Curated annotation (Swiss-Prot):
Residues 1-9 form a propeptide. InterPro entries: Ribosomal_bL27 (IPR001684), Ribosomal_bL27_CS (IPR018261). It comes from Streptococcus agalactiae serotype V (strain ATCC BAA-611 / 2603 V/R). GO terms for cellular component: cytosolic large ribosomal subunit. The gene is rpmA. The N-terminus is cleaved by ribosomal processing cysteine protease Prp. Keywords: Ribonucleoprotein, Ribosomal protein. Residues 11-33 are annotated as: Disordered. GO terms for biological process: translation. One of its GO terms (molecular function) is structural constituent of ribosome. This is Large ribosomal subunit protein bL27.
Length: 94
């Protein structure tokens, strides 16, 4: 009697898993208005997390630290002391 011992093995190894493969959406932070640009009141000037840039004249700070123009005018990015920066909006003389 001829008994065959047939054993089947996987011809490919298991795929395994990884802890990578995810990423968060970009938050589109940074300057939204350039130095010297004319903006209207309420325009967003700079989106940030924390206070990288401080609000200057005629600029407000939102709850998420976004800087926005309070009046219509020209945007100016300026130094505030030795190591800080601020953005101001100066009204256009009519």
């Amino acid at each position: 009697m001829n008994l065959a011992n047939l054993q089947l093995f996987a011809h490919k190894k298991g795929g395994g898993s990884t802890s990578n493969g995810r990423d968060s959406q970009a938050k589109r932070l940074g300057a939204k208005a350039a130095d010297g640009q004319t903006v209207s009141g309420g325009s967003i000037l700079y989106r940030q997390r924390g206070t990288h840039i401080y609000p200057g004249a005629n600029v407000g700070r939102g709850g998420d630290d976004t800087l926005f123009a309070k009046v219509e005018g020209v945007v100016r990015f300026e130094r505030k002391g030795r190591d800080k920066k601020q953005v101001s909006v100066y009204p256009i003389a009519k």
